[in-house]
From Swiss-Prot:
A Gene Ontology biological process term: translation
Keyword Kinase: no
Upper taxonomic lineage: Eukaryota, Viridiplantae, Streptophyta, Embryophyta, Tracheophyta
Broad class of where this protein is predominantly found: plastid
Oligomeric form and interacting partners: Part of the 30S ribosomal subunit.
Descriptive protein name: Small ribosomal subunit protein uS14c
GO terms under cellular component: chloroplast; small ribosomal subunit
Pfam families in the cross-refs: Ribosomal_S14
Gene name for this UniProt entry: rps14
Entry annotated with the keyword Chloroplast: yes
Function recorded in the entry: Binds 16S rRNA, required for the assembly of 30S particles.
Subcellular localization, as worded in the UniProt entry: Plastid, Chloroplast
Family the UniProt entry places it in: Belongs to the universal ribosomal protein uS14 family.
SUPFAM superfamilies, sorted: Glucocorticoid receptor-like (DNA-binding domain)
Amino acid sequence: MAKKSLIYREKKRQKLEKKYHLIRRSSKKEISKIPSLSEKWKIHGKLQSPPRNSAPTRLHRRCFSTGRPRANYRDFGLSGHILREMVHACLLPGATRSSW
């Protein structure tokens, strides 16, 4: 199980990303439309103003049950070993059992 502080930090990053998503998207559109390099630098400075944790690249997918940040399956939102346990216990509908 991941530490509660790490899970909380990840949720905080998700909130920040949602908050600043429109600002980042509009700034990127402006940069692509403007041909002047000096104006692009000004807009790029505006793009750097939101907090670092609001960048979408800083987000991690985490396992819903354990909070583990690695070996996650996007379709299920679970880490590998939890997914395997749930499939063997027939808790995931549509998933077939196999040993790997």
